[in-house]
């Protein structure tokens, strides 16, 4: 766990709350790259659960807003800022669809993840009151995310953000992109991240996986080769 020194006790430490740490990292990244970026996008470690339950979470927030001052609600923790931003982005995904279709290189990375990881497509369809339904479609049929594997539900938010939101010079922050992925699939995720970097996206990741870290390190070493040499070793010019 990340720690900070307590001013009252020179040699003692106390843990930094996870939400505060995330806010600090995001603020540092935005301050550092702010002059070069269009928008920062953050994919929290809890992205799978939030995406599966986004309707219930948004509905609860709307209900509390419309009944404020009329009903008393039990005290519950507020969403951290980055989680609230993630939820807002999910709700507005369909509205951004047309604008981001022109960014071909980045949506192509979303298609790469669908081809090599999810083995099916992630769709957005207008639901009741035009609230988006997020669905998974493969050869067996069409399913809501809560009926898919943990791997699909973890990768789905990445696919959606790449297809509809992230653009060149954006900052994309992903917590634990290797979560619920087999080592071979971790390699494919690392490949996707490299493709994003080559498309002009600034990517910041946190990871607990030595295997995933090693894959990224291999790609850094690979970047020292010429494009011709990379292709001769079985890699594309985007790797």
Predicted regions mapped to residue ranges:
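Switch/communication elements of ASCE P-loop NTPase nucleotide-binding domains
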Residues: 130-239
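Phosphate-coordinating catalytic segments in nucleotide- and nucleic-acid-processing enzymes
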Residues: 1-169, 199, 239
């Amino acid at each position: 766990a990340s720690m900070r020194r307590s001013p009252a006790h020179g040699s003692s430490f106390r843990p930094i709350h996870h939400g505060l740490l995330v806010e600090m990292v995001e603020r540092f990244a935005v301050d550092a790259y702010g002059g070069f970026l269009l928008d920062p996008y953050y994919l929290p470690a809890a992205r799978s659960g939030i995406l599966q339950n986004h309707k219930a979470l948004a509905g609860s927030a709307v209900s509390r807003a419309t009944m404020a001052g009329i009903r008393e609600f039990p005290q519950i923790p507020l969403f951290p800022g980055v989680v609230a931003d993630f939820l807002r982005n999910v709700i507005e995904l369909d509205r951004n669809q047309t604008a981001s279709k022109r960014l071909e290189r980045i949506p192509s990375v979303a298609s790469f993840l669908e081809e090599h990881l999810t083995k099916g497509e992630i769709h957005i369809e207008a639901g009741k009151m035009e609230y988006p339904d997020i669905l998974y479609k493969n050869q067996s049929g069409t399913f809501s995310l809560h009926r898919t594997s943990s791997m699909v539900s973890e990768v789905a938010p990445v696919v959606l953000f790449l297809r509809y939101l992230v653009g060149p010079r954006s900052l994309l922050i992903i917590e634990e992109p290797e979560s619920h992925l087999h080592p071979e699939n971790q390699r494919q995720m690392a490949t996707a991240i490299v493709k994003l970097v080559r498309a002009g996206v600034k990517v910041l990741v946190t990871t607990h996986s030595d295997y995933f870290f090693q894959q990224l390190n291999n790609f850094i070493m690979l970047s020292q080769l010429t494009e011709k040499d990379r292709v001769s070793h079985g890699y594309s010019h985007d790797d």
